[in-house]
Amino acid sequence: MSDRIDRDVINALIAGHFADPFSVLGMHKTTAGLEVRALLPDATDVWVIEPKTGRKLAKLECLDSRGFFSGVIPRRKNFFRYQLAVVWHGQQNLIDDPYRFGPLIQEMDAWLLSEGTHLRPYETLGAHADTMDGVTGTRFSVWAPNARRVSVVGQFNYWDGRRHPMRLRKESGIWELFIPGAHNGQLYKYEMIDANGNLRLKSDPYAFEAQMRPETASLICSLPEKVVQTEERKKANQFDAPISIYEVHLGSWRRHTDNNFWLSYRELADQLVPYAKWMGFTHLELLPINEHPFDGSWGYQPTGLYAPTRRFGTRDDFRYFIDAAHAAGLNVILDWVPGHFPTDDFALAEFDGTNLYEHSDPREGYHQDWNTLIYNYGRREVSNFLVGNALYWIERFGIDALRVDAVASMIYRDYSRKEGEWIPNEFGGRENLEAIEFLRNTNRILGEQVSGAVTMAEESTDFPGVSRPQDMGGLGFWYKWNLGWMHDTLDYMKLDPIYRQYHHDKLTFGMLYNYTENFVLPLSHDEVVHGKKSILDRMPGDAWQKFANLRAYYGWMWAFPGKKLLFMGNEFAQGREWNHDASLDWHLLEGGDNWHHGVQRLVRDLNHTYRHHKAMHELDFDPYGFEWLVVDDKERSVLIFVRRDKEGNEIIVASNFTPVPRHDYRFGINQPGKWREILNTDSMHYHGSNAGNGGAVHSDEIASHGRQHSLSLTLPPLATIWLVREAE
């Protein structure tokens, strides 16, 4: 043994308190010659082997009964490839020494990761099956700059943190190690002695797969192949495209009837995908599928941002689901949560014993409402972790859009906080400048790297320019949820019709700000939980009126400017609130034809009619695409407007939000001729009263509402009708 290795070093190494194992272990030049040292707990004999011949070159001496071996190779001066023959419990095993391999992360990668500008950090960090110097294994790397020691533990080393301590790259704070023989499918974690001397066991922030709760280990898994983005998928996201989104929680859309267990990704591909296609939706939006420990969070408190949840199957099963959606002509939107993460000890919280991913001050780093931690967007490595994750889902899974959750909680430092509970920014303001820059940067990078994919913001305030370009001072999102429209219209619809005349502006106010953003009109999962009731149950009146109100509302929503979003169950008027632990009430559609079938047929017809007529979607964000015909008839709660396409073709939309049919209702129009009724929410086909206009009506050369020509219609009770002018 070389006199350079003293007993204190051996003790520290065996105790797991030595931060630089490569300085001791592996092959080293010493005054005595080439010396090989190995830490192999429980081994009894160790030989150095010549791989080509299998010849034993030297037997290593056991210098410590806890497993430290060392020996000099005679007549060798230059480093060479070797193996170790190790006897454990009477059985000899031939292994490759992890400590004979050089640094793994290239200097450029290390620099980019430290700068926070590595577009795809997941290609370097995490666990990657690889072949090095002809040896198959897995290279591991994890960012933990303040840890005193980090080891890889897993099924390949008996979860023993003494066996595979990692190399620290001080310039980046990244620990790395290549472990020969570790392979896909094996479980692993990082064992570390943190900055405070505490022993911690952490899952991999960059793991591509993870165990299903309540277990928390990561799985070695190869990086998915890139998914080519097609022109059809790009076009389906554009501003002039028809976008009708079916929002789904995969764990409760439908369950196995015999045991109430979830459907798998592949079963959902076979059932959910064809259903959404048949219903006429253009997009599927998935509540977060990132791995998460608590079912009741619905996925909005993720611990594995890079890992699809194992609740429904493997990573490849999820890819199969997305491929099936694309084959059916459906784009896929993923709810993405870069705003906060849970406090679970096995995940990101105090990752290396310090507030690495989160702010240290709870006034900046703690969400009081959700008992979660807030990312420190000003830290370059943290921002890089998140930006890379956005790119990962789009490039590696073919996700077509990201819907960013709780944007308001990110961009305001005083979000849901009282005075004294938040820290102003450097200019004394309430805006979180680092979060704003992070969102702008994310949207910019996605626009540059994956043209055609888009982002949508759930932003609940009037922050200006959410869906405006960064060079105009905006955040750079493509779309923003119109939560104001949603609240106003639902508040209106829950009123008894006799009182609606006093709240007429709740339906018209949205047009005053409609062109300030690129809006999506959402009836999301948030509107059918926490005692808010189902959408159907918010409607006033008896059963007939409830369904009629709902149908009229849907007819209004699908005609109003903006893309559409409907949470699962609302398409057939589920009567109870959503329960994430149970299937939707599909039994409502069993037996004979009923009101629920009627609503389902209406939503299907709305989708198909909306998609067929460009006037209903082509100019959602252009004032030319909309015009009021009747806006002030609050006494009768009647509203009529025109939707228009680029060629000037018009569709008339008329809504009567009282149970009183309005006969001979005359209003002025722009284009005289024969107007055909293409949708009537009061049709008997939808279980309405079947009032209407006999399928079509001719205009009269009678002036009305400042226009030379007019129509005289029957407006059915609690109904919305659409009319299109037939060609001459």
Swiss-Prot record:
InterPro entries: A-amylase/branching_C, Branching_enzy, GlgB, GlgB_N, GlgB_N_E_set_prok, Glyco_hydro_13_cat_dom, Glyco_hydro_13_N, Glyco_hydro_b
One MF term in the entry's GO annotations: cation binding
Catalytic residues (UniProt): 405, 458
Keywords, sorted A to Z: Carbohydrate metabolism, Glycogen biosynthesis, Glycogen metabolism, Glycosyltransferase, Transferase
Gene Ontology CC entries for this record: cytosol
Pathway: Glycan biosynthesis; glycogen biosynthesis
GO biological process: glycogen biosynthetic process
Annotated EC: 2.4.1.18
A Pfam short name: GlgB_N
Reactions that this protein is recorded to catalyse: Transfers a segment of a (1->4)-alpha-D-glucan chain to a primary hydroxy group in a similar glucan chain
Task performed by this protein: Catalyzes the formation of the alpha-1,6-glucosidic linkages in glycogen by scission of a 1,4-alpha-linked oligosaccharide from growing alpha-1,4-glucan chains and the subsequent attachment of the oligosaccharide to the alpha-1,6 position.
HAMAP family in the cross-refs: GlgB (MF_00685)
NCBIfam families: branching_enzym, PRK05402.1, PRK12313.1
Family: Belongs to the glycosyl hydrolase 13 family. GlgB subfamily.
PANTHER family: 1,4-ALPHA-GLUCAN-BRANCHING ENZYME
Description of how the protein assembles with itself and partners: Monomer.
Protein name (record): 1,4-alpha-glucan branching enzyme GlgB
Organism encoding this protein: Escherichia coli O6:H1 (strain CFT073 / ATCC 700928 / UPEC)
